[in-house]
A protein has these predicted regions:
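N-terminal chloroplast transit peptides
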Residues: 1-29
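N-terminal plastid-targeting presequences
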Residues: 23-56
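RNase III-family endoribonuclease catalytic core
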Residues: 44-177, 181-182
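Short acidic capping loops at alpha-helix termini that bridge into adjacent secondary structure
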Residues: 185-188
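Pyridoxal 5′-phosphate
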Residues: 191-195
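Positively charged, low-complexity, intrinsically disordered RNA-binding extensions
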Residues: 196-204
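C-terminal edge-of-domain segments
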Residues: 203-219
């Protein structure tokens, strides 16, 4: 190695050694800063107060839910409920309550529009009193909060995602039941169904899911 190359190599090594500790210290400092700024969350759940909802002209909420489905031959007693309507199928939903994904995501859409806690906080699955509960109970409570906050259903659009069973033969019954449950006109409730093209757990009929978007109008 020529003298010039040797000097350059020595300078590069010295520069690397000098900068490495500073880089490490800077990373550690940032890490400590993050740890130091962590805020401990309050584990005590405070029930929502409808009177504190800001009175906007309209509010929009989105809800999503998914439940695993198992064969009735493997888990007898399971059932498949959608929008408060029982569907005959060779599989049923595994859930703490009745596993009605449509009603569950409607609850989340309504409470989400109001800026309130989700269904898991309002009706926790570790509370035995909700074990096997029919989901219309949850919808009734969400509607109570909505009305006490001074709102009504303006429009609701639901999309059920399931490979089987076919939802189309049941859509009218589901829609009518939702309108009755929500105290809304059928014309503002829409129910759609999509398959998942045999992809992942939804497409393999091992789960069922639903999305709901709701528009709330100030009364």
């Amino acid at each position: 190695m020529c003298l010039t190359s040797a000097v350059a190599a020595a300078r590069l090594t010295a520069a690397s050694s000098a900068t490495a500790p500073r880089r490490t210290a800077r990373i550690a400092s940032n890490s400590n800063a993050r740890r130091g700024s962590t805020t401990r969350l309050n584990a005590v759940f405070t029930p929502p107060d409808p009177t504190k909802v800001k009175p906007l002209p309209v509010r929009i909420g989105h809800g999503f839910d998914l439940h695993r489905m198992e064969l009735l031959t493997e888990m007898p007693g399971l059932e498949l409920w959608l929008g408060g309507i029982k569907l005959e199928h060779d599989r049923g939903c595994v859930a703490h309550s009745d596993g009605d994904v449509l009603l569950h995501c409607i609850v989340d859409a309504i409470t989400g529009a109001l800026g309130m806690p989700d269904i898991g906080q309002l009706f926790p699955d570790n509370d035995p009193k909700w074990k096997g509960c029919t989901s219309d109970v949850f919808v009734t409570e969400a509607c109570r909060l909505m009305r006490e906050a001074g709102y009504e259903i303006g429009n609701m659009d639901c999309t059920i995602i399931a490979q089987r069973p076919k939802i189309s033969p049941h859509k009218d019954a589901i829609r009518a039941n939702l309108a009755k449950m929500l105290g809304a006109d059928e014309s503002v409730i829409n129910v759609k169904a999509k398959t998942h093209e045999k992809v992942d757990s939804l497409g393999e009929n091992r789960s069922i899911a639903c999305h709901t978007v709701v528009l709330l109008n100030k009364v």
